[in-house]
């Protein structure tokens, strides 16, 4: 069973600190140029106060780490990177390796620096933290980066939610994150919809893995795309479960929240299964497959 977009959703509301995210700071006169030469997104043209999804790739074009990059420049260039906490150390190490003689400073900000997310409520103002709109989806509200203790105090008790509310909203909007919905170095940017979310610049110069990604784009060879799946019986499934149609494996699911999950799946096999009227299941649980609202890639949903 499938449909091209989710049924109408209640308004997205969450307000919490994210324990599974960390921040890096890249500063210095050549910070924008340095990041632009490494990451998939256009960084040099990023306006102050704006953000963009991006990824660092292997030379073979696989995602090492996805991230949100924010231009926090004031008098001096400063870019803040919002990344999965489990990937932060490795990302910082890799950026340091590429720094060479570039006039940049790379800091892995410590646990005293937190990232909070707020949607459905006005984001609190303050001088000790940075506030950015989520560049992937306006419905996902704002992200605040600053002292963890201050951010915790800024969230009113009557608005506070747990992190599960954020992840349920993220999944319902079709926004995959490395480490939760796919493993590092397992997927190309197209396979996790980074190109659909504005995280791949196809008109800029070279970056690591650019040749593979560009070839996939211009030849239209991306057969795997990340889709939303909704458990029809309301149950959740553990991450890593196979999504199957009969004896065909469509993909491997990530973590589930709110009876939904994300699956990078073979859309050619999905189309064949739907055309044949085959039931689709994730970890043995029947699911409905939903194409994200933002998706522009072709897929025959039957």
Predicted regions and their residues:
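Short amphipathic alpha-helix segments
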Residues: 55-60, 118-128, 233-246
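Short, conserved charged micro-motifs
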Residues: 30-35, 88-92, 123-126, 148-155, ...
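A common structural junction motif
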Residues: 42-43, 96-104, 155-165, 245-250, ...
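Glycine-rich, small/acidic residue-mixed loop/short-helix segments
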Residues: 192-200, 214-302
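Acidic, low-complexity central loop/insert segments
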Residues: 14-25, 68-176
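Short, conserved active-site entrance elements at the starts or edges of catalytic domains
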Residues: 163, 169-195, 232
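Acidic, proline/glycine-enriched N-terminal capping motif
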Residues: 1-65, 73-74
